[in-house]
Structures are given as structure tokens and as C-alpha cells.
Amino acid sequence: MISATQLRPGMVIKFNNELYSIFKMEHRTPGNLRGFVQVKMRKLSSGTMIEHRFSSEDRVERAALEEHEMEYLYDDGEYFYFMNTENYEQMHLTKDILGDSVEFLIPQLKVNIEFYEGKPISVELPPTVDLTVVETEPGIKGASVSNVTKPAKLETGLVVQVPPFINEGEKIRVSTAEGTYQERA
């Protein structure tokens, strides 16, 4: 159990017999009233966001999570297959658990998967991923860095805005947090 004032974004807590991931936390002490912690959190089972106000004295149960490094192998349309890099055991996950992470998954990508009581609950991607451009308008010769961008479809189906000098077949580095172009890879 931890104090509500110790909550931080990214932590997973058990609240009302459900697992929640802390999205945003703000500690407030208005005037001469008792302090409280305003928390915005995401229910891991359904993905719904809720807000809750904890008293500064409240105690919250932090979920004991196990983290394993896994390597993405392939998908068959329904399941996404991963291999544990320590013991080579394979497992599959559904798109419900992976969420938007599927837009960045390419074979041999190493990710961290968090488990609670033996069940996978979330996937942590690396900060950036190198992906190949499969469809975009032809590049403009002599184009340099500017505010002008064009859409580019990547090998995973993700569409990002790229500078005009990027062509089909090129590898680019994409931020997994924002889903945006970073640089050529």
C-alpha cells in the first residue's frame, strides 16, 4: 500500500477490485481545506478513462507487476505472437490488449510486456521504431526541411506526415508515443 500522494503517471494500481493505469495526477491543497489528489486513470480491462479524487491520507494498493522482454514474431489476423527472450516460450495476444501498439509492430521488435498474476495487461514499446515507407507521393528533388509535409503509408498500415524528400522504400524513424516522423533511419 502506498499513499495517494505517491501516485505517479504510468503506475498501475488496484482500485475497486480493478486494475487502473495512472494517466495524470495532481496534488491540490485549496486554502485551509485538507489536501487531495486528483487522478485521471485508465481502466485496463476496458480502456475507459475515469477521474477520482483521493484524500491525501488515503492508502492505495499498487499492483505487483512482472515485466518480461518479448520479441514480436508475426500475426495471423486475429492474434499477435510474441516470444519470451529468456526462455523462448511463445504466447499470443489480442488487439484488445495491444491497443494502438499494433501500428508499430514489426517482426523481431523487442517490447516489454507487463503481467499481473500471470496475465498480460500492457505492452511497452521502445521510444522509436524504424519503419519502411510503402506508399507516398514522389519526392521533390532539392526539397529541404520545411513546414511542408505529405502523408506516407508505412509497412504496418500507419499513416504519418513526412517531409517532401522522403520516398517509397525508405526507412524512417517514428516516435511510438506520438506516432510522428522523427528522421530518416
Positions of PLM-derived features:
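Acidic-enriched and Gly/Ser
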Residues: I2-A185
